[in-house]
Amino acid sequence: MRRNSERPVRITEVCLRDGSHVMKHQFTEEQVRFVTRALDEAGMHYIEVSHGDGLGGSTLQYGKSLVNEMKLIEAAVDECKQAQIAVLLIPGIGTIHELKQAANIGAKLVRVATHVTEADVSAQHIQFARELGMEVCGFLMMAHSASVEKLVEQGKLMESYGAEAVYVTDSAGALLPHEVRERIRALRQSLNIEIGFHGHNNLSVAVANTITAIEEGATRIDGSVRCLGAGAGNAQTEVLLAVLDRMGYKLDIDLYKMMDVAEEVVAPLLPVPQEIQKGSLVMGYAGVYSSFLLHAERAAQRFNVDARDILIELGKRKVVGGQEDMILDVAAELAKIKMEV
């Protein structure tokens, strides 16, 4: 698992959480079991399972789940012989009640996610997760939208609450490699805990960004097999593993088996092939939260406007995750302007 004397790099596979956005939160228990079993057999370290917006996300605003996420988490735990199940929790969407439920049925890791400038809202959840005996990471979302200094300040807060790692989370897929480098380096120099990176492929640099993060000392990284994640997906896990192997990193994950998981297990589940289309490209370009894509496309159809215009305007307004209601407001405003022209 180690390269020379470096700390081990650990991967969290997010296709069953981030990929829930692509699936419109309609994963079945059988699908979760099938994917989890295959990932576990391949040697994956962590497998994240929950609604796309984390615990408690099954709402009208974020999208209703077909199956209660606790049943999906329980099914995933049941299929694992060596991998550990992770969950995402966004304070204000998920609660400590749901976190306790997830822990009780076997989830071992929680990533507590906040907007990059709002780490203070994570204190209660991080501390409670530690009391539950869970492994706890902080997840600073929309990391492109804050200065490096602000990112470090917020990372230090999460560290002080008890987080065992802090992630630079490129929710919009907007960061370029040099921007990842300066952020990871600054956190590595300022914090005494592990640093992680979560990328999105909206500008086709998710794998490059992840490699850059590792080169700067990140030891926790995310991938989504077959790029099954919001927007254009995340760093494609099987590709990432191949690159890391070429670079000399040995992660004890079977590359051939991960290729097979991508081709034979996950690909048939995809509603459409994961590729960088104009909507996801605009999200990376404008710096918009990746899970906004489907909401923007639906709003564009409803109000007869261009989804790209909606996303660009959301980027200008610096709308963040949790403000999905703004998408309809922007679409309505654009439609009104269109009628007046």
Swiss-Prot record:
One of its GO terms (molecular function) is 4-hydroxy-2-oxovalerate aldolase activity. Substrate binds at residues 17-18, 171, 198, 289. The active site is at residue 21. Signal peptide: none annotated. Keywords: Aromatic hydrocarbons catabolism, Lyase, Manganese, Metal-binding. The keyword Manganese applies. Its EC number is 4.1.3.39. InterPro entries: 2-IPM_HCS-like, 4OH_2_O-val_aldolase, Aldolase_TIM, DmpG_comm, DRE_TIM_HOA, PYR_CT. Pfam families: DmpG_comm, HMGL-like. Belongs to the 4-hydroxy-2-oxovalerate aldolase family. This is 4-hydroxy-2-oxovalerate aldolase.
